[in-house]
A protein has these predicted regions:
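Bacterial N-terminal signal peptides that target proteins for export
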Residues: 2-13
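N-terminal signal peptide c-region/cleavage motif recognized by signal peptidases
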Residues: 19-21
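N-terminal, motif-rich segments that launch catalysis or mediate targeting to/interaction with membranes
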Residues: 23-134, 141-267
C-alpha cells in the first residue's frame, strides 16, 4: 500500500509531461496483440499461461489495464502506459519520470515474474495481464510521445467527418474502420515469417520504443489538415498492422523466455 501511495502522489507531476489519454490500442487492437501472442507461444508457455490466467485468454485479458482505470486504487499505474522521447533525443539521453513509464514497467514485470517477487504487480496473473497490455501500448507510435501534445491528444482532427484526435485515430479509429472482429483482424495480419519472428524477438524493449518514435515522426498530418479519411487509411494501415503484429510476436517472445524451453513450439 505504501508503494501504491508513493506512486499515486507522483502521478500529478508526471502527467504534466506525458500523454493524458493513454488507452493504447482500443479494445480490438489489444485483443489482436493478445491473440497473435497466443498463436506464437511454445506449448510449454501456452500451458503455463493458461494455468496462470485460468479461463481468461491473453486476447481477453489484454485490456485489463484500461478497464481498471475506473478504480482509483490503480491510478498510480496511469503513467506506465507510455513514455516520452522528444524529437531529436533517444530514450537514453532524455529525462525519465520518477513515477515510471512503459519501458521501465515492462522490464520490472519481467524481473518480478522471473523472481516470483511481486512489487508493482499484486501477483503473477496481474503481471501477465499487465505485460499483455503494455507490450501492445509500446507498439502504438503515439504512446511514445514527443512531450508537446500529450501523445497526439491535443492534435484535434476529424475522422471521416467525426470529431477525433490523432491519438484516438491510432488507438481505435483506423482499426475500427476496417470493420473486422479481432479474430478476423488476426487472420488478416498474422503472417510473420520465421526470420521476422526471430529478428523482432531479439530486439530490446528500448528498441521497440525507438521504432515507435521513428514512426511517430511520419504520421502527423500537415498542420493545416482538419480532416482525415481514406487517403490517411491507405497511407498508414500497413504500418499500423505491422505494429500490431510485432507487438503480439514480441509478447510471445517474452512469455516463451519466461515459461518455455525454446525448442517446444506449440503445434
Amino acid at each position: 500500500m505504501r508503494l501504491k501511495m508513493l506512486h499515486f502522489a507522483r502521478v500529478a507531476v508526471g502527467t504534466l509531461l506525458l500523454p493524458l489519454s493513454a488507452f493504447g490500442w482500443g479494445q480490438t487492437g489489444h485483443r489482436v496483440v493478445g491473440q497473435i501472442a497466443e498463436n506464437h507461444l511454445h506449448a510449454e508457455a501456452a500451458a503455463a499461461v493458461q494455468g496462470i490466467l485460468g479461463d481468461e485468454s491473453l486476447a481477453m485479458c489484454a485490456n485489463w489495464m484500461d478497464h481498471i482505470k475506473s478504480n482509483r486504487a490503480y491510478n498510480h499505474m496511469n503513467p506506465w502506459h507510455y513514455c516520452t522521447i522528444p524529437d531529436g533525443l533517444t530514450y537514453e539521453t532524455c529525462d525519465h519520470p520518477e513515477e515510471g513509464d512503459v519501458i521501465g514497467t515492462i522490464n520490472q514485470l519481467i524481473v518480478e515474474i522471473q523472481t516470483k517477487t511481486f512489487l508493482i504487480a499484486e501477483d503473477e496473473a496481474m503481471a501477465v495481464k499487465m505485460l499483455a497490455h503494455l507490450v501492445g501500448d509500446l507498439h502504438q507510435p503515439l504512446h511514445v510521445g514527443n512531450g508537446t501534445d500529450k501523445g497526439g491528444n491535443d492534435r484535434k482532427i476529424k475522422w471521416f467527418g467525426e470529431s477525433s484526435n490523432l491519438h484516438r485515430v491510432w488507438d481505435s479509429d483506423l482499426i475500427d474502420h476496417q470493420q473486422l472482429s479481432f479474430t478476423e483482424y488476426v487472420a488478416w495480419v498474422d503472417h510473420a515469417t520465421a526470420e521476422e519472428v526471430s529478428v523482432w524477438q531479439r530486439s530490446s524493449v528500448v528498441d521497440w520504443a525507438q521504432e515507435s518514435q521513428a514512426i511517430r515522426m511520419g504520421i502527423y498530418p500537415p498542420a493545416e489538415a482538419t480532416s482525415l479519411g481514406y487517403s490517411y487509411n491507405y497511407d498508414h494501415i500497413a504500418t499500423l498492422n505491422k505494429r500490431l503484429l510485432q507487438g503480439g510476436v514480441r509478447l510471445a517472445g517474452i512469455l516463451n523466455e519466461l515459461y518455455a524451453k525454446p525448442t517446444k513450439k506449440k503445434k
